[in-house]
Curated annotation (Swiss-Prot):
Domain of life: Eukaryota
Residue interval of the organelle targeting sequence: 1-23
Keyword match Transferase: no
Signal peptide residues on this chain, from the entry's feature table: none
Annotated protein name in UniProt: 4-hydroxy-2-oxoglutarate aldolase, mitochondrial
Source organism per UniProt: Mus musculus
Subunit (UniProt): Homotetramer.
Listed GO MF terms: (4S)-4-hydroxy-2-oxoglutarate aldolase activity; (R,S)-4-hydroxy-2-oxoglutarate aldolase activity; protein homodimerization activity
GO CC entries: mitochondrion
Annotated catalytic residues: 190 (schiff-base intermediate with substrate)
High-level lineage: Eukaryota, Metazoa, Chordata, Craniata, Vertebrata
Gene behind this protein: Hoga1
GO biological process, one term: glyoxylate catabolic process
InterPro entries: Aldolase_TIM, DapA-like, Schiff_base-form_aldolases_AS
Family affiliation: Belongs to the DapA family.
């Protein structure tokens, strides 16, 4: 049974054609997006009140939109109903002119199709689909092209590919990205791998398509802009939103020396809340910066005192605390 909040959002989505975007029409997704965390109570329930509080503060920054139910949102630990409810609540909380990109990836193609359609119905403007990875040994380019094509064929909203090899152990091959860029309902890629050469190559090889690449981390945002990326989905923007948006402005206006200086000061904090300490580190930092971070869902554990001190140093040594 779907909850009343979700049914209400579905009715609203159906009344507006499921999305502000028209299927098959390319949309401009350039800009900075924070991948929103999922707040939990002490009993591991989703805390929708704290979610709204965080969103209200994040909405004061010049983000292009918000990414919900990505890796930072702990989506593998949420039920399907919770994933939809979170997206529904975010849609209601954020300004109407902000894009809502929702993670809809599942392991099977059928489940991904169903989740993508449901995400559109509760208010998502764009679906972000992570690579299926449990059977990664059989996830060839052909298998992945088939998967994404089936999803994009049915999806009522545009699709963004999502490659995050640090979590999946699988990098979406360049040849697959190039092929998929030709699909009229696939508009871009979030690449979290950190290989700027790869990002530049993808931008180059998809230049004849209306295809956009978003950097998946603030740590290589400047370099990504330099090779043709149009924005970033950056976990660090949850705590240093103004600074990440400033880096975007510096890059877009060609102020490369100032951009380089700022980028240097973001690298260590970014690494700390991504690869080094992950979501527990990001949530702890959110608590320090006046947001609600709170606990993660098990099996993710809180930081040890030693880890917490190291995290604090990564921010204080760069002038952020």
């Amino acid at each position: 049974m779907l909850g009343p909040q979700i049914w209400a959002s579905m009715r609203q989505g159906l009344s507006r054609g499921l999305s502000r975007n028209v299927k098959g029409k390319k949309v401009d997704i350039a800009g900075i997006y924070p991948p929103v965390t999922t707040p939990f109570t002490a009993t591991a329930e989703v805390d929708y009140g704290k979610l709204e509080e965080n969103l209200n503060r994040l909405a004061t920054f010049p983000f292009r939109g918000f990414v919900v139910q990505g890796s930072t949102g702990e989506f593998p630990f949420l039920t399907s109903l919770e994933r939809l409810e979170v997206v529904s609540r975010v849609r209601q909380a954020i300004p109407k002119d902000k894009f809502l990109i929702a993670g809809s990836g599942c392991e099977s193609t059928q489940a991904t199709v169903e989740m993508t359609v449901s995400m559109a119905q509760v208010g998502a403007d764009v679906a972000m689909v992570v690579t299926p990875c449990y059977y990664r040994g059989r996830m060839s380019s052909a298998a992945l092209i088939h998967h994404y094509t089936k999803v994009a064929d049915v999806s009522p909203i545009p699709v963004v590919l999502y490659s995050v090899p640090a979590n999946t152990g699988l990098e979406l091959p360049v040849d697959a990205v190039v092929t998929l860029s030709q699909h009229p309902n696939i508009i871009g890629l979030k690449d979290s791998g950190g290989d700027v050469t790869r990002i530049g190559l993808i931008v180059h090889k998809t230049s004849k398509q209306d295809f956009q690449v978003l950097a998946g981390s603030a740590g290589f945002l400047l370099a990504s802009y330099a090779v043709g990326a149009v924005g970033g989905i950056c976990g660090l923007a949850n705590v240093l939103g103004a600074q990440v948006c400033q880096l975007e402005r510096l890059c877009l206006t060609g102020q490369w020396e100032a951009a380089q200086e700022l980028q240097h000061r973001l690298i260590e904090p970014n690494t700390a809340v991504t690869r080094r300490f992950g979501i527990p580190g990001l949530k702890k930092t959110m608590d320090w910066f006046g947001y609600y971070g709170g606990p993660c869902r098990a099996p993710l554990q809180e930081l040890s005192p030693t880890e917490e001190e190291a995290l604090r140093l990564d921010f204080s040594n760069n002038g952020w605390l």
